[in-house]
Protein backbone atom coordinates (compact mmCIF):
# COMPACT_ATOMS: atom_id res chain seq x y z
CA UNK A 1 0.00 0.00 0.00
CA UNK A 2 2.91 2.39 0.75
CA UNK A 3 4.59 2.24 -2.70
CA UNK A 4 1.38 3.39 -4.37
CA UNK A 5 1.22 6.52 -2.18
CA UNK A 6 4.80 7.47 -2.95
CA UNK A 7 4.19 6.94 -6.64
CA UNK A 8 1.16 9.25 -6.48
CA UNK A 9 3.19 12.01 -4.82
CA UNK A 10 5.91 11.75 -7.45
CA UNK A 11 3.32 11.93 -10.19
CA UNK A 12 1.78 15.14 -8.83
CA UNK A 13 5.23 16.74 -8.45
CA UNK A 14 6.07 15.84 -12.04
CA UNK A 15 2.87 17.48 -13.27
CA UNK A 16 3.72 20.70 -11.45
CA UNK A 17 7.15 20.81 -13.08
CA UNK A 18 5.63 20.26 -16.53
CA UNK A 19 3.19 23.14 -15.97
CA UNK A 20 6.04 25.46 -15.05
CA UNK A 21 7.95 24.51 -18.21
CA UNK A 22 4.89 25.04 -20.39
CA UNK A 23 4.30 28.52 -18.97
CA UNK A 24 7.79 29.63 -20.10
CA UNK A 25 7.32 28.46 -23.71
CA UNK A 26 4.69 29.98 -26.02
CA UNK A 27 1.38 28.16 -25.91
CA UNK A 28 0.91 27.90 -29.71
CA UNK A 29 3.32 27.41 -32.60
CA UNK A 30 2.98 28.23 -36.26
CA UNK A 31 3.42 24.70 -37.57
CA UNK A 32 2.43 25.69 -41.12
CA UNK A 33 5.31 28.13 -41.26
CA UNK A 34 7.67 25.45 -39.96
CA UNK A 35 6.55 23.04 -42.69
CA UNK A 36 7.07 25.69 -45.41
CA UNK A 37 10.60 26.36 -44.14
CA UNK A 38 11.28 22.62 -43.70
CA UNK A 39 11.89 23.15 -40.01
CA UNK A 40 10.76 20.73 -37.34
CA UNK A 41 12.30 21.31 -33.89
CA UNK A 42 10.54 18.26 -32.42
CA UNK A 43 12.83 15.81 -34.26
CA UNK A 44 16.62 15.76 -34.29
CA UNK A 45 18.66 14.39 -37.20
CA UNK A 46 20.43 12.05 -34.78
CA UNK A 47 17.21 10.15 -34.18
CA UNK A 48 17.00 9.21 -37.87
CA UNK A 49 20.00 6.90 -37.51
CA UNK A 50 17.94 4.47 -35.45
CA UNK A 51 15.85 3.53 -38.50
CA UNK A 52 17.58 0.81 -40.51
CA UNK A 53 16.26 1.30 -44.01
CA UNK A 54 17.17 -1.19 -46.75
CA UNK A 55 18.94 0.73 -49.50
CA UNK A 56 19.02 -0.45 -53.11
CA UNK A 57 22.23 -2.19 -54.26
CA UNK A 58 24.95 -0.15 -55.89
CA UNK A 59 25.65 3.54 -55.57
CA UNK A 60 22.97 5.39 -53.69
CA UNK A 61 21.98 8.86 -54.80
CA UNK A 62 21.94 11.53 -52.11
CA UNK A 63 18.50 12.74 -53.14
CA UNK A 64 17.06 9.22 -52.81
CA UNK A 65 18.50 8.95 -49.30
CA UNK A 66 16.99 12.30 -48.37
CA UNK A 67 13.63 11.21 -49.75
CA UNK A 68 13.82 8.03 -47.68
CA UNK A 69 14.53 10.02 -44.52
CA UNK A 70 11.65 12.35 -45.27
CA UNK A 71 9.26 9.42 -45.78
CA UNK A 72 10.39 7.89 -42.49
CA UNK A 73 9.91 11.20 -40.76
CA UNK A 74 6.43 11.62 -42.22
CA UNK A 75 5.48 8.11 -41.20
CA UNK A 76 5.81 9.13 -37.58
CA UNK A 77 2.69 11.19 -37.90
CA UNK A 78 0.72 8.04 -38.84
CA UNK A 79 1.14 6.40 -35.48
CA UNK A 80 4.88 5.97 -35.14
CA UNK A 81 5.28 8.47 -32.33
CA UNK A 82 3.35 8.88 -29.13
CA UNK A 83 3.13 12.65 -29.00
CA UNK A 84 2.55 13.33 -32.70
CA UNK A 85 0.01 11.01 -34.25
CA UNK A 86 -3.21 11.36 -36.18
CA UNK A 87 -4.62 8.05 -34.96
CA UNK A 88 -6.77 7.67 -31.88
CA UNK A 89 -4.82 6.18 -29.03
CA UNK A 90 -6.10 2.67 -28.44
CA UNK A 91 -6.88 1.81 -32.04
CA UNK A 92 -3.24 1.39 -32.99
CA UNK A 93 -2.26 -1.75 -31.06
CA UNK A 94 1.48 -1.29 -31.59
CA UNK A 95 1.28 2.23 -30.23
CA UNK A 96 -0.85 1.07 -27.32
CA UNK A 97 1.68 -1.58 -26.32
CA UNK A 98 4.48 0.96 -26.59
CA UNK A 99 2.69 3.39 -24.30
CA UNK A 100 2.00 0.67 -21.77
CA UNK A 101 5.63 -0.43 -21.72
CA UNK A 102 6.80 3.16 -21.19
CA UNK A 103 4.36 3.66 -18.32
CA UNK A 104 5.62 0.50 -16.63
CA UNK A 105 9.29 1.42 -17.10
CA UNK A 106 9.07 5.00 -15.84
CA UNK A 107 8.44 4.28 -12.12
CA UNK A 108 11.18 1.63 -12.06
CA UNK A 109 13.71 3.99 -13.61
CA UNK A 110 12.86 6.81 -11.23
CA UNK A 111 13.15 4.51 -8.25
CA UNK A 112 16.52 3.35 -9.50
CA UNK A 113 17.73 6.95 -9.71
CA UNK A 114 16.71 7.54 -6.12
CA UNK A 115 18.56 4.45 -4.96
CA UNK A 116 15.43 2.52 -4.01
CA UNK A 117 14.92 -1.05 -5.23
CA UNK A 118 11.46 -2.47 -5.53
CA UNK A 119 10.91 -6.22 -5.33
CA UNK A 120 9.22 -7.92 -8.31
CA UNK A 121 5.50 -8.39 -8.22
CA UNK A 122 5.75 -12.14 -7.83
CA UNK A 123 7.76 -11.84 -4.61
CA UNK A 124 5.55 -9.17 -3.05
CA UNK A 125 3.36 -10.63 -0.37
CA UNK A 126 -0.15 -9.26 -0.11
CA UNK A 127 -0.94 -7.94 3.33
CA UNK A 128 -4.40 -7.30 4.73
CA UNK A 129 -5.59 -5.09 7.53
CA UNK A 130 -8.92 -6.80 8.20
CA UNK A 131 -10.01 -10.42 8.31
CA UNK A 132 -12.95 -9.71 5.99
CA UNK A 133 -10.64 -8.44 3.24
CA UNK A 134 -8.45 -11.51 3.60
CA UNK A 135 -11.42 -13.90 3.33
CA UNK A 136 -12.80 -12.05 0.30
CA UNK A 137 -9.39 -12.26 -1.41
CA UNK A 138 -9.09 -15.97 -0.67
CA UNK A 139 -12.59 -16.81 -1.93
CA UNK A 140 -12.30 -14.76 -5.14
CA UNK A 141 -8.62 -14.99 -6.15
CA UNK A 142 -7.49 -18.33 -4.70
CA UNK A 143 -10.53 -20.40 -3.78
CA UNK A 144 -8.67 -23.69 -4.18
CA UNK A 145 -6.65 -23.00 -1.05
CA UNK A 146 -9.62 -22.84 1.33
CA UNK A 147 -12.27 -25.09 -0.24
CA UNK A 148 -11.85 -28.34 1.64
CA UNK A 149 -14.35 -31.10 2.31
CA UNK A 150 -15.63 -31.21 5.86
CA UNK A 151 -15.44 -34.71 7.31
CA UNK A 152 -18.41 -34.03 9.58
CA UNK A 153 -20.71 -33.86 6.55
CA UNK A 154 -19.69 -37.06 4.83
CA UNK A 155 -22.63 -38.95 3.27
CA UNK A 156 -24.48 -40.92 5.92
CA UNK A 157 -22.49 -39.64 8.91
CA UNK A 158 -24.76 -36.99 10.47
CA UNK A 159 -28.41 -37.77 11.17
CA UNK A 160 -31.28 -36.08 13.01
CA UNK A 161 -33.18 -38.05 15.65
CA UNK A 162 -36.76 -36.93 16.32
CA UNK A 163 -38.43 -37.92 19.58
CA UNK A 164 -42.04 -38.68 18.64
CA UNK A 165 -43.08 -40.00 22.08
CA UNK A 166 -43.85 -38.30 25.35
CA UNK A 167 -45.23 -35.11 23.85
CA UNK A 168 -41.89 -33.89 22.47
CA UNK A 169 -42.93 -33.89 18.82
CA UNK A 170 -42.29 -30.15 18.41
CA UNK A 171 -38.90 -30.23 20.08
CA UNK A 172 -35.62 -29.68 18.25
CA UNK A 173 -34.19 -32.96 16.89
CA UNK A 174 -31.07 -34.48 18.34
CA UNK A 175 -28.00 -34.61 16.11
CA UNK A 176 -26.34 -38.01 15.92
CA UNK A 177 -22.86 -38.47 14.43
CA UNK A 178 -21.70 -41.87 13.27
CA UNK A 179 -18.14 -43.01 13.24
CA UNK A 180 -16.11 -42.23 10.16
CA UNK A 181 -15.33 -45.93 9.74
CA UNK A 182 -19.05 -46.78 9.56
CA UNK A 183 -19.73 -44.31 6.76
CA UNK A 184 -19.57 -45.46 3.14
CA UNK A 185 -16.39 -44.58 1.33
CA UNK A 186 -17.03 -41.49 -0.83
CA UNK A 187 -16.19 -41.69 -4.49
CA UNK A 188 -13.03 -39.87 -5.41
CA UNK A 189 -13.18 -37.65 -8.45
CA UNK A 190 -9.94 -37.35 -10.35
CA UNK A 191 -9.45 -34.62 -12.92
CA UNK A 192 -7.08 -35.70 -15.65
CA UNK A 193 -5.59 -33.33 -18.18
CA UNK A 194 -5.35 -35.14 -21.53
CA UNK A 195 -2.70 -34.11 -24.00
CA UNK A 196 -3.98 -32.53 -27.19
CA UNK A 197 -1.94 -34.90 -29.38
CA UNK A 198 -3.72 -37.89 -27.85
CA UNK A 199 -7.09 -36.36 -28.65
CA UNK A 200 -5.97 -35.72 -32.23
CA UNK A 201 -4.94 -39.35 -32.63
CA UNK A 202 -8.28 -40.54 -31.26
CA UNK A 203 -10.09 -38.26 -33.71
CA UNK A 204 -8.05 -39.74 -36.58
CA UNK A 205 -8.91 -43.27 -35.48
CA UNK A 206 -12.61 -42.42 -35.35
CA UNK A 207 -12.42 -40.89 -38.82
CA UNK A 208 -10.79 -44.08 -40.14
CA UNK A 209 -13.60 -46.15 -38.62
CA UNK A 210 -16.17 -43.87 -40.19
CA UNK A 211 -14.53 -44.23 -43.59
CA UNK A 212 -14.31 -47.98 -43.13
CA UNK A 213 -18.10 -48.30 -42.76
CA UNK A 214 -18.52 -46.99 -46.32
CA UNK A 215 -16.43 -49.80 -47.80
CA UNK A 216 -13.00 -48.17 -47.91
CA UNK A 217 -9.98 -50.17 -46.75
CA UNK A 218 -8.60 -49.15 -43.37
CA UNK A 219 -4.99 -48.12 -43.03
CA UNK A 220 -2.91 -51.03 -41.80
CA UNK A 221 0.47 -50.74 -40.21
CA UNK A 222 3.38 -52.95 -41.23
CA UNK A 223 3.87 -54.40 -37.78
CA UNK A 224 0.31 -55.69 -37.65
CA UNK A 225 0.73 -58.10 -40.59
CA UNK A 226 1.60 -60.98 -38.26
CA UNK A 227 -1.57 -60.41 -36.30
CA UNK A 228 -3.55 -60.29 -39.55
CA UNK A 229 -2.15 -63.67 -40.61
CA UNK A 230 -3.24 -65.18 -37.32
CA UNK A 231 -6.69 -63.71 -37.75
CA UNK A 232 -6.96 -65.29 -41.22
CA UNK A 233 -6.07 -68.74 -39.85
CA UNK A 234 -8.72 -68.40 -37.16
CA UNK A 235 -11.25 -67.37 -39.77
CA UNK A 236 -10.41 -70.36 -42.00
CA UNK A 237 -10.85 -72.77 -39.10
CA UNK A 238 -14.13 -71.07 -38.32
CA UNK A 239 -15.36 -71.58 -41.89
CA UNK A 240 -14.35 -75.25 -41.97
CA UNK A 241 -16.13 -76.01 -38.71
CA UNK A 242 -19.18 -74.15 -39.92
CA UNK A 243 -19.31 -76.16 -43.15
CA UNK A 244 -18.91 -79.44 -41.25
CA UNK A 245 -21.76 -78.61 -38.92
CA UNK A 246 -23.95 -77.77 -41.92
CA UNK A 247 -23.27 -81.10 -43.62
CA UNK A 248 -23.84 -83.18 -40.49
CA UNK A 249 -26.96 -81.40 -39.35
CA UNK A 250 -28.45 -81.33 -42.84
CA UNK A 251 -29.88 -77.84 -42.49
CA UNK A 252 -28.71 -74.26 -42.60
CA UNK A 253 -28.71 -72.59 -39.20
CA UNK A 254 -29.07 -68.81 -38.97
CA UNK A 255 -28.72 -67.45 -35.45
CA UNK A 256 -30.58 -64.23 -34.72
CA UNK A 257 -29.12 -61.83 -32.20
CA UNK A 258 -32.52 -60.70 -30.98
CA UNK A 259 -34.04 -64.18 -30.61
CA UNK A 260 -34.64 -65.32 -27.02
CA UNK A 261 -34.01 -69.07 -26.73
CA UNK A 262 -34.49 -71.58 -23.90
CA UNK A 263 -31.41 -72.97 -22.14
CA UNK A 264 -29.58 -75.47 -24.34
CA UNK A 265 -30.01 -79.19 -23.65
CA UNK A 266 -26.95 -81.42 -23.24
CA UNK A 267 -25.21 -81.95 -26.54
CA UNK A 268 -25.38 -85.44 -28.10
CA UNK A 269 -22.01 -87.10 -28.50
CA UNK A 270 -22.34 -87.66 -32.23
CA UNK A 271 -22.77 -84.05 -33.30
CA UNK A 272 -19.86 -81.65 -33.60
CA UNK A 273 -20.71 -78.08 -32.77
CA UNK A 274 -18.60 -74.99 -33.15
CA UNK A 275 -16.53 -74.73 -30.02
CA UNK A 276 -13.85 -72.10 -30.07
CA UNK A 277 -12.86 -72.67 -26.45
CA UNK A 278 -11.26 -76.06 -27.28
CA UNK A 279 -8.88 -74.44 -29.71
CA UNK A 280 -5.45 -73.47 -28.62
CA UNK A 281 -5.48 -69.83 -27.64
CA UNK A 282 -2.85 -67.66 -29.27
CA UNK A 283 -0.69 -65.59 -26.94
CA UNK A 284 -1.41 -61.87 -27.20
CA UNK A 285 1.00 -59.85 -29.29
CA UNK A 286 2.39 -56.87 -27.43
CA UNK A 287 2.21 -53.49 -29.15
CA UNK A 288 5.65 -51.97 -29.61
CA UNK A 289 4.95 -49.33 -32.24
CA UNK A 290 6.20 -45.88 -31.33
CA UNK A 291 3.15 -44.17 -32.85
CA UNK A 292 0.65 -46.36 -31.04
CA UNK A 293 -1.05 -44.75 -28.04
CA UNK A 294 -1.72 -48.16 -26.45
CA UNK A 295 1.92 -49.30 -26.25
CA UNK A 296 2.47 -52.48 -24.23
CA UNK A 297 -1.15 -53.59 -24.21
CA UNK A 298 -2.09 -57.07 -25.39
CA UNK A 299 -4.05 -57.69 -28.57
CA UNK A 300 -7.47 -59.04 -27.69
CA UNK A 301 -9.21 -60.02 -30.93
CA UNK A 302 -12.70 -61.41 -31.23
CA UNK A 303 -13.56 -64.18 -33.66
CA UNK A 304 -14.04 -62.48 -37.02
CA UNK A 305 -16.79 -63.09 -39.52
CA UNK A 306 -16.44 -64.94 -42.76
CA UNK A 307 -15.15 -61.87 -44.56
CA UNK A 308 -12.12 -60.62 -42.65
CA UNK A 309 -11.47 -57.79 -45.12
CA UNK A 310 -14.72 -56.06 -44.23
CA UNK A 311 -14.30 -52.97 -42.10
CA UNK A 312 -15.86 -52.95 -38.62
CA UNK A 313 -19.13 -51.14 -38.17
CA UNK A 314 -20.01 -49.74 -34.78
CA UNK A 315 -23.50 -49.95 -33.32
CA UNK A 316 -24.19 -46.25 -33.66
CA UNK A 317 -23.17 -46.29 -37.35
CA UNK A 318 -25.67 -48.88 -38.52
CA UNK A 319 -28.29 -47.86 -41.02
CA UNK A 320 -31.27 -48.63 -38.81
CA UNK A 321 -31.73 -50.27 -35.39
CA UNK A 322 -34.76 -52.09 -36.75
CA UNK A 323 -32.62 -54.25 -39.01
CA UNK A 324 -31.62 -56.36 -36.05
CA UNK A 325 -35.23 -56.95 -35.13
CA UNK A 326 -36.11 -58.25 -38.59
CA UNK A 327 -36.02 -62.03 -38.29
CA UNK A 328 -35.94 -64.02 -41.50
CA UNK A 329 -38.81 -66.34 -42.32
CA UNK A 330 -36.46 -69.28 -42.49
CA UNK A 331 -34.62 -68.81 -39.18
CA UNK A 332 -34.75 -71.46 -36.49
CA UNK A 333 -33.00 -71.85 -33.14
CA UNK A 334 -29.57 -73.40 -33.06
CA UNK A 335 -30.65 -75.93 -30.44
CA UNK A 336 -33.82 -77.21 -28.86
CA UNK A 337 -37.03 -78.33 -30.55
CA UNK A 338 -37.92 -76.76 -33.85
CA UNK A 339 -40.69 -74.20 -33.36
CA UNK A 340 -43.69 -74.26 -35.62
CA UNK A 341 -43.72 -71.28 -37.94
CA UNK A 342 -46.19 -70.04 -40.48
CA UNK A 343 -44.55 -69.99 -43.94
CA UNK A 344 -44.68 -66.93 -46.16
CA UNK A 345 -47.50 -68.48 -48.17
CA UNK A 346 -49.89 -70.36 -45.89
CA UNK A 347 -51.31 -73.71 -46.87
CA UNK A 348 -53.99 -73.22 -49.54
CA UNK A 349 -57.57 -74.06 -48.86
CA UNK A 350 -57.60 -76.38 -51.83
CA UNK A 351 -55.18 -78.49 -53.80
CA UNK A 352 -52.48 -80.84 -52.57
CA UNK A 353 -51.11 -80.17 -49.12
CA UNK A 354 -47.44 -79.38 -48.97
CA UNK A 355 -45.26 -81.70 -46.87
CA UNK A 356 -44.52 -80.46 -43.37
CA UNK A 357 -41.13 -79.30 -42.16
CA UNK A 358 -40.49 -82.52 -40.24
CA UNK A 359 -41.10 -84.81 -43.22
CA UNK A 360 -39.01 -83.24 -45.95
CA UNK A 361 -36.95 -80.26 -44.97
CA UNK A 362 -34.56 -78.80 -47.45
CA UNK A 363 -32.69 -75.57 -47.69
CA UNK A 364 -35.30 -72.85 -47.89
CA UNK A 365 -32.95 -70.55 -49.74
CA UNK A 366 -32.96 -73.03 -52.62
CA UNK A 367 -36.76 -73.23 -52.37
CA UNK A 368 -37.01 -69.45 -52.64
CA UNK A 369 -34.77 -69.40 -55.71
CA UNK A 370 -36.84 -72.15 -57.33
CA UNK A 371 -40.06 -70.30 -56.51
CA UNK A 372 -38.86 -67.04 -58.09
CA UNK A 373 -37.65 -68.93 -61.16
CA UNK A 374 -41.05 -70.54 -61.53
CA UNK A 375 -43.01 -67.33 -61.12
CA UNK A 376 -40.89 -64.94 -63.17
CA UNK A 377 -41.38 -66.31 -66.71
CA UNK A 378 -44.81 -67.89 -66.38
CA UNK A 379 -47.18 -65.85 -64.29
CA UNK A 380 -46.68 -62.32 -65.67
CA UNK A 381 -46.39 -63.70 -69.20
CA UNK A 382 -50.06 -64.70 -69.24
CA UNK A 383 -51.10 -61.02 -68.99
CA UNK A 384 -48.71 -59.49 -71.51
CA UNK A 385 -51.54 -59.06 -74.01
CA UNK A 386 -53.36 -56.64 -71.67
CA UNK A 387 -52.93 -52.94 -72.43
CA UNK A 388 -54.00 -51.13 -69.27
CA UNK A 389 -53.90 -47.60 -70.68
CA UNK A 390 -56.50 -48.42 -73.35
CA UNK A 391 -58.68 -50.66 -71.20
CA UNK A 392 -59.53 -48.17 -68.45
CA UNK A 393 -62.67 -47.02 -70.26
CA UNK A 394 -65.00 -50.02 -70.04
CA UNK A 395 -65.02 -53.16 -68.01
CA UNK A 396 -66.12 -55.42 -70.89
CA UNK A 397 -62.76 -55.03 -72.60
CA UNK A 398 -60.97 -56.77 -69.73
CA UNK A 399 -62.73 -60.08 -70.30
CA UNK A 400 -61.11 -62.84 -72.29
CA UNK A 401 -63.13 -64.68 -74.98
CA UNK A 402 -63.56 -67.65 -72.65
CA UNK A 403 -64.67 -65.58 -69.65
CA UNK A 404 -68.28 -64.84 -68.77
CA UNK A 405 -67.69 -62.23 -66.06
CA UNK A 406 -65.90 -61.55 -62.86
CA UNK A 407 -66.80 -60.82 -59.29
CA UNK A 408 -64.93 -59.29 -56.40
CA UNK A 409 -63.66 -62.13 -54.26
CA UNK A 410 -64.42 -61.65 -50.55
CA UNK A 411 -61.42 -61.12 -48.31
CA UNK A 412 -60.12 -64.20 -46.58
CA UNK A 413 -57.55 -64.64 -43.89
CA UNK A 414 -55.76 -67.37 -45.86
CA UNK A 415 -53.17 -66.14 -48.34
CA UNK A 416 -53.38 -68.13 -51.58
CA UNK A 417 -50.36 -69.48 -53.39
CA UNK A 418 -50.24 -68.22 -57.01
CA UNK A 419 -48.86 -71.58 -58.13
CA UNK A 420 -51.92 -73.41 -56.81
CA UNK A 421 -54.54 -70.92 -58.03
CA UNK A 422 -56.66 -71.67 -61.04
CA UNK A 423 -56.97 -69.35 -64.01
CA UNK A 424 -60.49 -68.34 -63.01
CA UNK A 425 -59.41 -67.26 -59.53
CA UNK A 426 -56.55 -65.24 -60.97
CA UNK A 427 -59.02 -63.49 -63.28
CA UNK A 428 -61.26 -62.66 -60.33
CA UNK A 429 -58.46 -60.98 -58.42
CA UNK A 430 -57.32 -59.06 -61.48
CA UNK A 431 -60.87 -57.94 -62.19
CA UNK A 432 -61.21 -56.44 -58.71
CA UNK A 433 -58.12 -54.35 -59.38
CA UNK A 434 -59.57 -53.12 -62.68
CA UNK A 435 -62.90 -52.32 -61.04
CA UNK A 436 -61.20 -50.19 -58.43
CA UNK A 437 -59.40 -48.27 -61.17
CA UNK A 438 -62.71 -47.78 -63.03
CA UNK A 439 -64.31 -46.22 -59.95
CA UNK A 440 -61.44 -43.80 -59.60
CA UNK A 441 -61.64 -42.93 -63.30
CA UNK A 442 -65.40 -42.35 -63.04
CA UNK A 443 -64.87 -39.87 -60.19
CA UNK A 444 -62.32 -37.97 -62.25
CA UNK A 445 -64.69 -37.80 -65.21
CA UNK A 446 -67.47 -36.40 -63.03
CA UNK A 447 -65.19 -33.71 -61.64
CA UNK A 448 -64.08 -32.78 -65.18
CA UNK A 449 -67.71 -32.49 -66.29
CA UNK A 450 -68.55 -30.20 -63.36
CA UNK A 451 -65.60 -27.94 -64.11
CA UNK A 452 -66.91 -27.28 -67.63
CA UNK A 453 -69.94 -25.55 -66.13
CA UNK A 454 -69.32 -21.73 -66.15
CA UNK A 455 -71.06 -21.37 -62.78
CA UNK A 456 -68.89 -24.05 -61.16
CA UNK A 457 -66.59 -22.80 -58.43
CA UNK A 458 -63.64 -25.02 -57.53
CA UNK A 459 -63.35 -26.17 -53.93
CA UNK A 460 -59.56 -26.19 -53.99
CA UNK A 461 -59.37 -23.09 -51.78
CA UNK A 462 -62.45 -23.80 -49.68
CA UNK A 463 -60.33 -24.44 -46.59
CA UNK A 464 -58.97 -20.89 -46.82
CA UNK A 465 -62.50 -19.40 -46.85
CA UNK A 466 -64.65 -21.51 -44.49
CA UNK A 467 -68.38 -21.10 -45.04
CA UNK A 468 -67.96 -19.24 -48.31
CA UNK A 469 -69.08 -22.09 -50.60
CA UNK A 470 -72.59 -22.09 -49.11
CA UNK A 471 -72.78 -18.33 -49.52
CA UNK A 472 -71.57 -18.55 -53.13
CA UNK A 473 -74.09 -21.26 -54.07
CA UNK A 474 -76.91 -19.19 -52.60
CA UNK A 475 -75.98 -16.20 -54.74
CA UNK A 476 -75.45 -18.13 -57.98
CA UNK A 477 -78.49 -20.34 -57.61
CA UNK A 478 -81.00 -17.60 -56.84
CA UNK A 479 -82.85 -15.63 -59.55
CA UNK A 480 -83.34 -12.60 -57.31
CA UNK A 481 -81.01 -9.66 -57.11
CA UNK A 482 -78.26 -10.11 -54.52
CA UNK A 483 -78.58 -8.48 -51.12
CA UNK A 484 -76.03 -5.67 -51.14
CA UNK A 485 -76.98 -4.28 -47.73
CA UNK A 486 -74.05 -6.02 -46.04
CA UNK A 487 -71.48 -4.97 -48.61
CA UNK A 488 -68.82 -2.58 -47.38
CA UNK A 489 -69.18 0.59 -49.47
CA UNK A 490 -66.32 2.48 -47.83
CA UNK A 491 -66.39 5.82 -46.05
CA UNK A 492 -68.44 7.56 -48.79
CA UNK A 493 -71.39 5.20 -48.62
CA UNK A 494 -74.79 6.64 -49.50
CA UNK A 495 -77.99 5.73 -47.72
CA UNK A 496 -76.30 4.61 -44.50
CA UNK A 497 -77.24 5.78 -41.04
CA UNK A 498 -75.14 8.38 -39.30
CA UNK A 499 -74.75 9.70 -35.77
CA UNK A 500 -77.42 12.36 -36.17
CA UNK A 501 -80.01 9.69 -37.01
CA UNK A 502 -79.89 8.48 -33.39
CA UNK A 503 -80.96 10.31 -30.30
CA UNK A 504 -78.47 8.88 -27.81
CA UNK A 505 -74.90 7.71 -27.96
CA UNK A 506 -75.87 4.23 -26.71
CA UNK A 507 -78.18 3.60 -29.67
CA UNK A 508 -75.46 4.68 -32.09
CA UNK A 509 -72.91 2.30 -30.47
CA UNK A 510 -75.44 -0.53 -30.48
CA UNK A 511 -76.07 0.03 -34.20
CA UNK A 512 -72.34 -0.10 -34.96
CA UNK A 513 -71.93 -3.33 -33.01
CA UNK A 514 -74.76 -5.07 -34.87
CA UNK A 515 -73.75 -3.77 -38.29
CA UNK A 516 -72.14 -6.39 -40.54
CA UNK A 517 -69.91 -5.46 -43.43
CA UNK A 518 -68.38 -7.90 -45.88
CA UNK A 519 -65.63 -6.92 -48.32
CA UNK A 520 -66.75 -5.73 -51.70
CA UNK A 521 -64.54 -8.30 -53.43
CA UNK A 522 -66.68 -11.11 -51.99
CA UNK A 523 -69.73 -9.86 -53.93
CA UNK A 524 -67.71 -9.58 -57.13
CA UNK A 525 -66.34 -13.13 -56.91
CA UNK A 526 -67.23 -15.13 -60.03
CA UNK A 527 -68.48 -12.10 -61.98
CA UNK A 528 -65.37 -11.59 -64.10
CA UNK A 529 -64.56 -14.59 -66.26
CA UNK A 530 -62.03 -15.31 -69.00
CA UNK A 531 -64.27 -14.25 -71.91
CA UNK A 532 -65.24 -10.84 -70.54
CA UNK A 533 -67.49 -9.56 -67.80
CA UNK A 534 -70.53 -11.74 -67.14
CA UNK A 535 -73.38 -10.78 -64.89
CA UNK A 536 -75.72 -13.05 -63.00
CA UNK A 537 -78.45 -12.38 -65.57
CA UNK A 538 -76.73 -14.95 -67.73
CA UNK A 539 -78.39 -17.77 -65.79
CA UNK A 540 -81.88 -16.36 -66.44
CA UNK A 541 -81.12 -15.80 -70.14
CA UNK A 542 -79.96 -19.37 -70.46
CA UNK A 543 -83.14 -20.70 -68.80
CA UNK A 544 -85.26 -18.56 -71.13
CA UNK A 545 -83.38 -19.89 -74.13
CA UNK A 546 -83.97 -23.48 -73.06
CA UNK A 547 -87.69 -22.79 -72.57
CA UNK A 548 -87.96 -21.29 -76.06
CA UNK A 549 -86.22 -24.26 -77.63
CA UNK A 550 -88.50 -26.66 -75.75
CA UNK A 551 -91.55 -24.72 -76.93
CA UNK A 552 -90.41 -24.94 -80.56
CA UNK A 553 -89.82 -28.69 -80.27
CA UNK A 554 -93.31 -29.17 -78.83
CA UNK A 555 -94.85 -27.20 -81.72
CA UNK A 556 -93.01 -29.35 -84.28
CA UNK A 557 -94.22 -32.53 -82.58
CA UNK A 558 -97.85 -31.33 -82.47
CA UNK A 559 -97.67 -30.30 -86.14
CA UNK A 560 -96.47 -33.76 -87.18
CA UNK A 561 -99.06 -35.42 -84.99
CA UNK A 562 -101.87 -33.37 -86.54
CA UNK A 563 -100.61 -34.16 -90.06
CA UNK A 564 -100.75 -37.88 -89.32
CA UNK A 565 -104.22 -37.65 -87.80
CA UNK A 566 -105.48 -35.39 -90.61
CA UNK A 567 -106.13 -32.39 -88.41
CA UNK A 568 -106.35 -28.72 -89.37
CA UNK A 569 -102.77 -27.50 -89.66
CA UNK A 570 -103.83 -24.08 -91.04
CA UNK A 571 -105.51 -23.11 -87.75
CA UNK A 572 -102.28 -23.93 -85.91
CA UNK A 573 -100.29 -21.66 -88.23
CA UNK A 574 -102.83 -18.85 -87.77
CA UNK A 575 -102.54 -19.14 -83.99
CA UNK A 576 -98.75 -18.87 -84.23
CA UNK A 577 -99.04 -15.78 -86.44
CA UNK A 578 -101.31 -14.03 -83.93
CA UNK A 579 -98.93 -14.53 -80.96
CA UNK A 580 -96.74 -11.39 -80.69
CA UNK A 581 -93.01 -12.03 -80.81
CA UNK A 582 -90.86 -10.69 -78.04
CA UNK A 583 -88.47 -8.01 -79.20
CA UNK A 584 -84.91 -7.96 -77.87
CA UNK A 585 -83.82 -4.69 -76.39
From Swiss-Prot:
Effect of loss of the gene: No visible phenotype, but slower growth.
Cell compartments where the protein resides: Nucleus
Phosphothreonine found at: 579
GO biological process: RNA splicing
Compositionally biased intervals (Basic and acidic residues): 15-39, 276-288, 530-548
Basic residues bias locations: 1-14
Organ and tissue specificity: Highly expressed in seedlings at 7 days after germination, young flowers before anthesis and developing siliques. Expressed at lower levels in roots, expanding leaves, open flowers, dry seeds and inflorescences. Not detected in senescing leaves.
Entry keyword set: Nucleus, Phosphoprotein, Repeat
Keyword Amino-acid biosynthesis set for record: no
R-[ED] repeat start-end pairs: 16-17, 29-30, 36-37, 258-259, 322-323, 436-437, 445-446, 450-451, 540-541, 542-543
GO cellular component: nuclear speck; nucleus
InterPro entries xrefs: Red-like, RED_C, RED_N
Pfam families registered for this protein in UniProt: RED_C, RED_N
Location of region: Disordered: 1-52, 219-324, 523-585
Record keyword Phosphoprotein present: yes
Main location: nucleus
S-S bonds: none
Quaternary context: Component of the spliceosome. Interacts with SMU1.
Function: Auxiliary spliceosomal protein involved in splicing of specific pre-mRNAs that affect multiple aspects of development.
Similarity comment: family membership: Belongs to the RED family.
Protein known as: Suppressor of mec-8 and unc-52 protein homolog 2
Species annotation: Arabidopsis thaliana (Mouse-ear cress)
Gene coding for it: SMU2
Amino acid sequence: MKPSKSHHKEKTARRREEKLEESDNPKYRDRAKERRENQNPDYDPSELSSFHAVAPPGAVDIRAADALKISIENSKYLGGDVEHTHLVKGLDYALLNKVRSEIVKKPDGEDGDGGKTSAPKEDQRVTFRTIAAKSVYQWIVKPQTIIKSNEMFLPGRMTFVYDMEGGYTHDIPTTLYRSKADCPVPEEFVTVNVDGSVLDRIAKIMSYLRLGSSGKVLKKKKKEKDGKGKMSTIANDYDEDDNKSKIENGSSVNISDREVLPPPPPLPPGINHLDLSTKQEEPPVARTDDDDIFVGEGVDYTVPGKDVTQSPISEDMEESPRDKEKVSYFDEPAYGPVQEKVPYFAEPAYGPVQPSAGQEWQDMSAYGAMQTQGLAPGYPGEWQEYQYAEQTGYQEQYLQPGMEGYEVQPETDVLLDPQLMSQEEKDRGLGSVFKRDDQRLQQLRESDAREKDPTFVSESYSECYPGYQEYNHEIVGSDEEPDLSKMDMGGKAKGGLHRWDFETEEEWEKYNEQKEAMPKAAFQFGVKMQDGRKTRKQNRDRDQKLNNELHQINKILTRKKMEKEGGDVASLDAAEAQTPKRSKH
